[in-house]
UniProtKB/Swiss-Prot annotation:
Protein name, entry field: Leucyl/phenylalanyl-tRNA--protein transferase
Pfam families, sorted: Leu_Phe_trans
Family according to the record: Belongs to the L/F-transferase family.
Record lineage: Bacteria, Pseudomonadati, Pseudomonadota, Gammaproteobacteria, Vibrionales
GO biological process terms on file: protein catabolic process
GO CC entries: cytoplasm
A GO molecular function held by the record: leucyl-tRNA--protein transferase activity
Amino acid sequence: MTIYLTELDTTSIEFPSPFDALDEPNGLLAFGGDLSPIRILNAYSQGIFPWYGPGEPILWWSPAPRAVFNPKTFEPSKSLKKFQRKHNYRVSINQATDRVIGYCSSLRPEEETWLNNDMQAAYRELASLGFCHSVEVWQGDELIGGLYGLQRGQVFCGESMFSLKTNASKIALWYFCEHFTQFGGQLIDCQVMNPHLESLGAIEVDRDEFLSSLRLLKETSVNDACSKKQWLKEMP
């Protein structure tokens, strides 16, 4: 079967409507363009994100349904709370964004990373411009887990997470949900559901609902203090 896709013009940052995305493969919308900050920010503001593998052109996606967290209602399990009381992992914001992106790009067993050098460079540039943020989890002075993503108003678009020690990424998400809510955050976009996200309480919403929420929430900023370098959990 022939697939017809829009090729993005390198002189324009415009995208097709997310409602034009293919059903199969789910959410594929366009190809080409570049990974400039202005294009990526425009994409995320419309519920579109880049994802492509080795040897492929830049591919742009807007899948349906969409996996999301409501940070207000996120509830860590009793076992996770007990684990954290015992281990006292430290948690920070934007203390090691480059390293978090680097760890997230590391190859997983039997998997080729989608987070290639160009993608890493793009997110690092967005971090330097104040749009990409990270959460870090530490055991003492050792970075053991974290997550990163882009913020568009009251929406945090989660990109990737990693764990080098048990429960580290879960703790990153837990503390970030509490922190983001405190500053007015309303929605965390996880893009596509997987068993790990589902186990943490992510839900799926249809494209209409997600894009409607995004259009509304991206227009209201959270306080700048939300993303300043800080510690959410220090050693007792």
